[in-house]
Amino acid sequence: GIMDSVKGLAKNLAGKLLDSLKCKITGC
């Protein structure tokens, strides 16, 4: 349903944000 796709999008965004934070902190 719509909520499932919203949750999926949120997970993708959170993952990208976490990855970029890790890159800034520890280097990629």
Swiss-Prot record:
InterPro entries: Antimicrobial_frog_2 (IPR012521). Keywords: Amphibian defense peptide, Antibiotic, Antimicrobial, Cytolysis, Disulfide bond, Hemolysis, Secreted. GO terms for biological process: defense response to bacterium; killing of cells of another organism. Disulfide bonds join C23-C28. The keyword Acyltransferase does not apply. Its main location: secreted. The keyword Membrane does not apply. GO terms for cellular component: extracellular region. Expressed by the skin glands. Pfam families: Antimicrobial_2. Belongs to the frog skin active peptide (FSAP) family. Ranatuerin subfamily. Antibacterial activity against Gram-negative bacterium E.coli. Very weak hemolysis activity. This is Ranatuerin-2BYb.
